[in-house]
Amino acid sequence: MQKQAELYRGKAKTVYSTENPDLLVLEFRNDTSAGDGARIEQFDRKGMVNNKFNYFIMSKLAEAGIPTQMERLLSDTECLVKKLDMVPVECVVRNRTAGSLVKRLGIEEGIELNPPLFDLFLKNDAMHDPMVNESYCETFGWVSKENLARMKELTYKANDVLKKLFDDAGLILVDFKLEFGLYKGEVVLGDEFSPDGSRLWDKETLEKMDKDRFRQSLGGLIEAYEAVARRLGVQLD
């Protein structure tokens, strides 16, 4: 399957059309951003690591019965995916306090959250992805009530699957975001799951193994991503 026209260039991925109108090529670049794209740097191997990491996670979620857009890997940095009509709202699950939640509520980082928190954010970099709720989604027509309920159900199911997967690898799944779209009327998981859009801590040391290493200038970003991938059994080379 050959990629054709560039359709969209995001902060770290590029989307291309193919000869099949129902399929797209997703290319993972080496770009890494923070502050809604205000700060961007390139890291060798990052596109490859995230592409293979994402394929591994999407495969695990599909095995658990969660519909995903993933079709197959095409190269070290590219995968073939279904073309979705993306919902402009992202779902976030929080198993521990971190990130914007800590700032918003003025609470300590690392508190276990039981049951996990579920948040919704409008995908809008210019507005810094404002937090919204189910009422906003219905009133502004971003997603139907039924489809939003399905997105929430699938997000919690993914959390159950991934918490165990990472726990078995000696990691804490602190929080993560998921994006969904519609494919022939069905809610399907799209975009990606990688250390770019999740928080992962070492279970023993609580060392951060995700993009917070870049956001907080801790260094060792790719080394951390590759360490997480190896623990999970992702084949990188």
UniProtKB/Swiss-Prot annotation:
GO biological process: 'de novo' IMP biosynthetic process; cobalamin biosynthetic process
CDD domains with a match to the protein in the record: SAICAR_synt_PurC
An example Gene Ontology molecular-function term: ATP binding
Any one annotated GO CC term: cytosol
Key words, A-Z: ATP-binding, Ligase, Nucleotide-binding, Purine biosynthesis
TM regions (residue ranges): none
A family per Pfam: SAICAR_synt
Enzyme class at the top of the EC tree: ligase
EC number: 6.3.2.6
Pathway: Purine metabolism; IMP biosynthesis via de novo pathway; 5-amino-1-(5-phospho-D-ribosyl)imidazole-4-carboxamide from 5-amino-1-(5-phospho-D-ribosyl)imidazole-4-carboxylate: step 1/2
InterPro entries tied to this protein: SAICAR_synt/ADE2_N, SAICAR_synt_PurC, SAICAR_synth, SAICAR_synthetase, SAICAR_synthetase_CS
Superkingdom field: Bacteria
Catalytic activity as recorded in UniProt: 5-amino-1-(5-phospho-D-ribosyl)imidazole-4-carboxylate + L-aspartate + ATP = (2S)-2-[5-amino-1-(5-phospho-beta-D-ribosyl)imidazole-4-carboxamido]succinate + ADP + phosphate + 2 H(+)
Sequence similarity: Belongs to the SAICAR synthetase family.
Full protein name: Phosphoribosylaminoimidazole-succinocarboxamide synthase
Species, as recorded: Escherichia coli O7:K1 (strain IAI39 / ExPEC)
Gene: purC
